[in-house]
């Protein structure tokens, strides 16, 4: 185990990524001989310029679970195109019983979002956004709903290409 911990500390990636822990849960497996305790961690990683990833890790110790979550988040990153530090347009996301509504905001508004959504926007590099979550506040479902909504977002050039029009026609 000491070898694993020294490996974790020596391989701390310095890739300019921002990391945020969302949740750490203690989980229990009941067996014939008693209870086996473990930990489940949920984390998000972003580059501050629109790339974001979510990961979850499980282990008998918290630091190992957190490390696994961070590594998975780095592997599963998606790219979201931002517009001057905010979103392109209003977007909604849903996962399970969690629903989120995300609206672009003017300069100086800040990040108006709660819980896991705030952490996502901070690591992603969004500086002005208004977000509201309804339904379940389970952190895992809220993160998945937020990422699903962000993945659905389109730039004006993508919409113009789909419709076979110019960007000027789309923007009016």
From Swiss-Prot:
| Ribonucleoprotein keyword on record | yes
Check the record and name the SUPFAM superfamilies matching this protein: dsRNA-binding domain-like, Ribosomal protein S5 domain 2-like
Q: Which family does it belong to?
A: Belongs to the universal ribosomal protein uS5 family.
Quaternary context:
Part of the 30S ribosomal subunit. Contacts proteins S4 and S8.
**Full protein name:** Small ribosomal subunit protein uS5
GO process annotations (BP):
translation
Per the record, GO CC terms? small ribosomal subunit
Domain observations: The N-terminal domain interacts with the head of the 30S subunit; the C-terminal domain interacts with the body and contacts protein S4. The interaction surface between S4 and S5 is involved in control of translational fidelity.
Q: Write down the Gene3D superfamilies for this protein, in alphabetical order.
A: 3.30.160.20, 3.30.230.10
State one Pfam family annotation: Ribosomal_S5_C
Per UniProt, the keywords (alphabetical) are:
Ribonucleoprotein, Ribosomal protein, RNA-binding, rRNA-binding
Q: The S5 DRBM domain covers which part of the protein?
A: 17-80
- InterPro entries, alphabetized: Ribosomal_Su5_D2-typ_SF, Ribosomal_uS5, Ribosomal_uS5_bac-type, Ribosomal_uS5_C, Ribosomal_uS5_N, Ribosomal_uS5_N_CS, Ribsml_uS5_D2-typ_fold_subgr
Top-rank taxon of the source lineage equals Bacteria
This chain's function reads: With S4 and S12 plays an important role in translational accuracy.
Q: Which GO terms describe its molecular function?
A: rRNA binding; structural constituent of ribosome
